[in-house]
Amino acid sequence: MIKIITGRQTDPLQEKILATAIENYQQHPENETFIIVPNHIKFTTEVRAINKLASSKKQTETAVKNLHVLSFSRLAWFFLKDAEQGLPTQLDDAASAMLLTHIIEQKQDELIIFEQSNSGMVRQLYNTILQVYDGNLDLDNIDETNLDQETKSKIHDLRIIYDAFIEEIAGKFSTKNEVQVQLNDILAKNSELKNASFYFCDFSHFSLQEMLTIQILMRKAKNVTLAFKTRLGNINPKAEAGDYDYVIQQTIRRLVSFLQERDMDYVASEFPIPSEPTPREILNSLWTETVSKVDELKQVQLVKADSRYAEAYFVARTIYQQVALNNYRYRDFLILAPDLKEYETYLTPILRQNNIPFFNDLQQEMKYHPLVVLIENLFNLRDLKENPFQTQSMLAILKTHLLIPSWYKEEAEYIHDVDELENFVLAHGINHNLWKKHFADFVSAEVIRLDKIDEEVAKIDRLRGYLVDKVTNLFTKLEQEKDSQKALTIFFDFLTKNGIAERLEQWRDAANNAGDLQQAQQPEQLWDLLIQLLKDYLAINPEKFDLDEFFNMLISAFKEATFSQIPSTLDAVNLSEMGMVQTSGYKQVFIIGATSGNLPSIEKKPGFLTTENLNQLQSSFESDAYLEDNQRLNNLDQNYQFGLSLALAQDRVYISYPVLNASNEKLDPSIYYQRLQDYGAPEFSQHDLPEKMQELLSFITNPDASLGYLAYINSNTSDEAIDELLKITQKYLPQKVKAVLDASDFDNQPEDIGEDLAAELYGKNLYSSVSQLETFYENSYEYFLTYGLKLRRRLENEFDVIQAGNYFHETFDRLVKRLNEQHIDLADLSSVELEQQLNQVRDVIKDESKYAQLMNDPFNQYLFHCLDHTTSKVAQNWRKSLAETPLRAKYSELSFGLDQKIKGISLDIPDLPGNHQVNLRGKIDRVDLANFAEKDQVLAQVIDYKSSAKKFDLGMFYNGIALQMISYLDVLTNNNRFFAEEDKLSLLGAFYQTVTRQLERLNSNKLIDSSLNLRENAIDSKPKLMYTGLISNNPEILLEAEPLLDGKSSQASQLYTGVGTKARGGFKLPADRNFSEEEFQLLLEYDEYLIKEASRQILSGQIKLNPYRYGRSKNALTYSDFKDIFFFDAMLRHNQYHEISNMSKKDLLVKIKEKLGKKD
């Protein structure tokens, strides 16, 4: 008897099938009764069937013999277990990936499109090979006449790889779907099926081999019953692509056609339509458009959440409250998501916080396990000659905690040493062969605290030596070994003799003791797979061992492998993904992540053969030999699958989406969400935090999870109900409640430390630098952390912007000092002679340890080469410009301050009890002098090197953030005798020298004037190299600095940006950047005022979180290392930026006079 039962998506077809099958079993217990369901729901269906059988006997439990609940794969093993000829070892996904990688590398020269293998490509190829095998397709019979070049090339490569694959596994392995082929062979020969009954349900589609199984059973078995859920609960032979139930109707059509072509009798019946539809059935009718509208849609609740966190919390809160208040069980709830990985960091922690048991049936990949990480990074270290000991891989191995030396008795001690070793390695730039050197060889540089602690360095050096020896010994042996058996023994011994296997056992036991059965299984599953892979490799490649091939196969295999999972309790919320078959019987279903990008879940990435490729191959397919377009089937089935998800909920279904993703990007709801909204489904807004008292119920669960929300609303609202809830919570969590309530009153503004503690940190007198005080004015809290507590980010010896800047400075410093020592005027050198001088300077610099370590990296060598080009360009421009001016570089990197030849800025600090001073130290990049003996005068200018263009900002100076240039001028003024002896020291100004070789764009107006003529002086980007900054507006001083301007009208300066002569006489000067001698004196006085004021606040212990902000894009937090300490949020009332804006010279001088108490 063959029956095809159809029903709607809400009809209890599984219940019908189970009842029919159990009735048949009870009537004929001596005969076999089989219930066949998708593998995903086999366990729950089996439990349900046995419970149903027990209930029919009015028992709580029962034993069965001939009643079987199986999936197709289990059905195959059922019949194969007694077969005379058993199957060879099954080749799982991981081993298949290994074999295919091997074949692709072997057949490289014959293949057209496969240049190299990768895990994604291997996965696609393997699925296609399984399809070809499953689909009885002979690739040699494909007609290539009308195929395009892409399809021809793919078939060409597929044929080569497929034949090689089949040849390799013949007699040794079976594919995971070969068992289905063997099943059909056995069933076709089985004469005992005439008394067996088969019942199929919860399928919407069958593979070709599964379809063949059903067809054999239809011809040989006593009973075959199949149940299908369609749109109207009937068979529609005219269904077309795009119809709601097209995929399942196609499945039914193939079965019916098979029966009709062979004149086989069958009965088609429809599940009866109830007279009074339930809300669930009404929803299904609405979704399948069998009714156009309803008065009220009670079955659905739409949820618009502020974020994924809010969405996940809504789910947990709803489940918690339903279980607590409405007698639900946890197993009554199902959570579905189009992509469950998006909610990994939200959903499971929130469920755990609310003590909600759950089972996540999303398969967990093995590739993230520490053992796989260890193997991958060992492989990265295989090249001991050309690319040895890559720091990233060495550290990654240590951090797996699998390769721990035996002298460590406590893991905490090992972790401490790994952290210290990482700090040391990064600080000293240790990479490649430098790992072979003892760490003691690096400590002379004294770049970190650890360099001065010999005992600690010795400990981490021992760990370094251990790892280097283990890696070296392993790969030295493997490189020399050509026999696969011996090579695998070497690798296996490495894992076992170094305690890695023992470590995995410890992890397993610890997880078992903690009751985490899922985690406890992982080490064992991983180790079992590794053993199997080693066996498989030996079977695939028994003779000639290839190191790279072995590791590539191993890594590819692990990337394809997943951990098997079991639920730790039967009463648990189930987490799954849309599209996976689910058992019926859930009371409430949550569909989360219903965004426009996720639902419908359109598959955009094709398989190895695309839809276009398969369309071209259609003419070569037959009814019993074809390839299906799984991507197309998936996309056509989306509406139907969503309807199935809606129908799973007996009581209610919740569909939710987040308004924002983790990157704060706006998300739109799915078209399915919008469609339900159009049908009249109510929408609820779930916020991240309760905005008012009435919303609090949306956040209340257990005391632990609810406390934060109670504290939040308590800080914003005064209500007796909140006080009562907090009192109740305090009974369960007294310490945590106190801590959270105290935290809700937390103000992240730092407290002043007072004069006594400030004196301990800084001393009685403040010894500081200009740049440090600039940090104070940028954000005084950062000054405290940096120079008070001396916090530092971890030092990494890498060639960054700071290192590049240091190299620029050092190059120019040594050049100036070298020329002065040799009494050479830079202006007298030729271009070639200057380059020779620079090369000699560079050779000396690069031999120093701090740069020599960087030169081990070829890329760093290239960067140094680029920097040398830049310094040459700047130096050559400087040499040429000296023809315009008598100013010559007299001092470079000139230090000032206590114990220096040059006095620093020493000032008494006012308004502070006791006698306190501030002493500023620092270095001036360059001081240029010109001696005018006939005038008893020395002209001076300060030069400061910058790696990018910079202008002196008056607003920044006024607020203490740009003190450097004025302070340097103050140092010159205070050291008149040093620079000019008895003569007068005249200040030309302080200027920035941009160190760059950047050229102007060809279409820049700086290169081409309004008449479309080329600006000659801009061809080599000379304007970018001219001095910018503060300049004297004294005509006499200007002419002394650049004599060639004398007597010329409308002549632009060749040295200073914005300076030139006017047509009618006089000078054109940069607006707001030119000052008279009296104005310079005012700037110097204000500079000292700012220095004293900052020093007073520092020594009095005042600290503020007051970062500056200049406009919208520039602020003190942009490059700060302490943002995680500040927790600065401009939206909080306690946190405010110190706003700064540019100002004119006029406004600056007025404000300075006000501050200093001077009258105009």
From Swiss-Prot:
Coiled coil ranges: none
SUPFAM superfamilies documented for this protein: P-loop containing nucleoside triphosphate hydrolases
Listed EC numbers: 3.1.-.-
InterPro entries: ADDB_N, DNA_helicase_suRexB, P-loop_NTPase, PDDEXK_AddAB-type
GO MF assignments: 5'-3' exonuclease activity; ATP binding; double-stranded DNA binding; helicase activity; hydrolase activity, acting on acid anhydrides
Pfam families: ADDB_N, PDDEXK_1
GO term, biological process aspect, one: double-strand break repair via homologous recombination
Cross-referenced Gene3D superfamilies: P-loop containing nucleotide triphosphate hydrolases (3.40.50.300)
Keyword tags: ATP-binding, DNA damage, DNA repair, DNA-binding, Exonuclease, Helicase, Hydrolase, Nuclease, Nucleotide-binding
Needed co-factor(s): Mg(2+)
TM region positions: none
Function: The heterodimer acts as both an ATP-dependent DNA helicase and an ATP-dependent, dual-direction single-stranded exonuclease. Recognizes the chi site generating a DNA molecule suitable for the initiation of homologous recombination. This subunit has 5' -> 3' nuclease activity but not helicase activity.
Subunit details: Heterodimer of AddA and RexB.
Annotated family: Belongs to the helicase family. AddB/RexB type 2 subfamily.
Misc. remarks from the entry: Despite having helicase-like domains, this subunit does not have helicase activity.
HAMAP family xref list: AddB_type2
Protein name: ATP-dependent helicase/deoxyribonuclease subunit B
Species of origin: Lactobacillus helveticus (strain DPC 4571)
